[in-house]
């Protein structure tokens, strides 16, 4: 299909639906020595923005080197600073320290106030696709999906939504430096009352003279892509609608029509 995924488990997060990610992970789980005799109840996917929300509720985290992470700087640390200030082999240890501290503090202060604050934040994070869950227990999954925690393609004609999905193709940590923005302008006419012009922009904010100052782990190990992001971009039309008249400026390819899981979409590659 258009995803062209490898056998790397990290590719599983590329699916647009959490259910597809969960089923793919379950398939791998059953093939692993540590998974074949252990039942997998479900999956939870989070990114550093979710961890930052946890720190905001549970309290600051102090790292061994004296760095203090809080509800404002945690995401930047985990997505960028940890790579600029530490060697690649040290980064996983820092992630473990932060995760352990968050969970420990959360369990220690699990009261109604904490639960209320988390619930409000988690709904927003799920809507923005920083957080997703799926349960293999049907009755529980119904509740999770109803609460908006199992991501799916939008199928609401009343509130049409254009889907734009990106996945990095240059093994690097360049995502932090890519500014993504969207402009939407309604250009409806009598014959087409629900017509919009959408402009989606990817801007690399890393200056050329800064590339050499960063490690290959951040900028990428391939000379032809060093300091550049290479994004595979998928565009999904609003449910019941269509996309047309693509125009590209810069080094992106013109989106080509494709399909995935019986849904029409358009794929492009942008550097």
Model-found features: residue ranges?
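Non-catalytic, solvent-exposed segments at the cell envelope interface
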Residues: 1-271
């Amino acid at each position: 299909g258009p995803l062209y995924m490898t056998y790397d488990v990290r590719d599983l997060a590329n699916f647009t639906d959490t259910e597809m990610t969960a089923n793919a992970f379950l398939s791998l789980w059953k093939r692993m020595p540590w998974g074949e005799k252990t039942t997998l109840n479900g999956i939870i996917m989070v990114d550093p923005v979710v961890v930052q929300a946890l720190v905001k509720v549970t309290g600051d985290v102090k790292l061994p080197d004296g760095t203090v992470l809080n509800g404002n700087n945690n995401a930047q640390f985990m997505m960028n600073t940890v790579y600029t200030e530490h060697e690649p082999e040290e980064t996983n240890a820092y992630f473990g320290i932060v995760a352990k501290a968050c969970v420990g503090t959360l369990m220690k202060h699990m009261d109604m106030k904490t639960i209320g604050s988390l619930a409000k934040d988690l709904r927003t994070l799920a809507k923005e696709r920083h957080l997703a869950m799926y349960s293999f227990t049907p009755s529980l999954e119904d509740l999770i999906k109803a609460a908006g925690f199992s991501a799916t393609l939008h199928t609401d004609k009343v509130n049409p939504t254009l889907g734009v999905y990106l996945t990095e193709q240059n093994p690097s940590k360049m995502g932090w430096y890519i500014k993504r923005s969207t402009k939407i302008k309604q250009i409806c006419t009598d014959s087409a009352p629900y017509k919009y012009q959408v402009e989606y922009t990817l801007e690399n904010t890393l200056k050329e003279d800064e590339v050499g100052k960063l490690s290959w782990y951040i900028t990428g190990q391939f000379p032809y892509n060093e300091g550049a992001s290479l994004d595979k971009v998928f565009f999904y039309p609003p449910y019941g609608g269509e996309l047309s008249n693509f125009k590209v400026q810069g080094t992106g390819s013109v989106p080509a029509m494709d399909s995935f899981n019986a849904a029409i979409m358009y794929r492009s590659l942008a550097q």
